[in-house]
Amino acid sequence: LTPATLNSERFVVTGTGSSEAHARYLATLLNLHTDRAAAYLPLSGFVDAPATNFAAKTLVVFSQGVSPNAQIALQRGIDFEHTVLFSATTPEAAEEAGKPDRAQMLRNLESNRGELVEFPLAEEYTTLIRFVGPIAGYLAALQFVGQFSESRAPLPCVETLQPLLQSKAPNELRDAMCHLPSAFAGGFNLITAAPISDYSQNLACKFMEGLFWTCPGISDFLQFAHGPFQQMTAHPKPAVILQGDGRGEAEMVDRSVAMLRGVGASAYVIKVDAPPLLSIFGFEAALNDAVFAAMQHLSVDQVNWPGKGRDDLLYGFCPDQ
């Protein structure tokens, strides 16, 4: 990382789609595992915000392909002390993809002493859902924070990550999603512990993007008892529970399963034996497994997805310049 990045103390982090999860993950890492401070701000928050909101801060944008709307934030870079872009797109890749304006924007970023942090996979756009970029973005954020001198975040080795990336969904969950899709398609509950609940957006969105189902609601274990449980008791729906390696978490899982089964609701537990900053890799892999199995079984057309080419009024709110 450049000295300007390493010397940054306050960050404003943004991203949308699967990149929202990466941005929130980085904010968690910076706030809890370094002596620095970060705030997540959705892209629309950059449209009319006064420049004074951003003074003396570093802007961090996550966008796998530097989507048009990610450029809303990047165009506000002049109001920040420094800018960092996490992306799979390089000037060369953008040129090859026939996007010269985007290539020039990336060159301008670097010529103005901004920093481009690359992660795979460039041009992962044949299908609506993405599998490589979402996982790689978490790792890029973790490696980024690991370069700060006071970082307390773990830097995983290949031997640690490999078994997590081979995680599978329980057979009963795969079977239920394949053979009883109507039980899940209208939405279900995704229950997990903090801090995962703060950066689990892509775990939910993969069902919306991969299967075109209603995005499941995300609840922290203790939050689940404050409304979501009562609502699903009135209108039964399944719950998928994510369990890491914490002892307190194990008790919350047991209590959640007992509550759900007590009202006749289906509960499926995905267990990943890793701490929160690493278990996200296992949960991504396990839910990818479930989604991919259901996509195959239900013959979902991921190339000609619903609404393709009809979203530009908002997707292209900020055109390439």
Where are these regions (language model features)?
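Active-site phosphate/pyrophosphate-binding segments
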Residues: 1-9, 113-235, 313-321
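Glycine-rich phosphate-binding loops that contact phosphosugars or nucleotide phosphates
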Residues: 6-158, 235-273
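Conserved active-site and cofactor/substrate-binding residues in soluble primary-metabolism enzymes
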Residues: 17-21, 25, 132-139, 194-198, ...
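Short, well-ordered alpha-helices that flank and scaffold nucleotide-derived cofactor binding pockets
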Residues: 28, 32, 205, 209, ...
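Secondary-structure boundary/capping signal
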Residues: 34-38, 211, 215, 302
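Short secondary-structure transition/capping segments
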Residues: 51-52, 97-98, 227-230, 281
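Short active-site-adjacent structural elements
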Residues: 225-228, 249-251, 276-281
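Charge-biased C-terminal accessory regions appended to nucleic-acid-, cytoskeletal NTPase
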Residues: 261-321
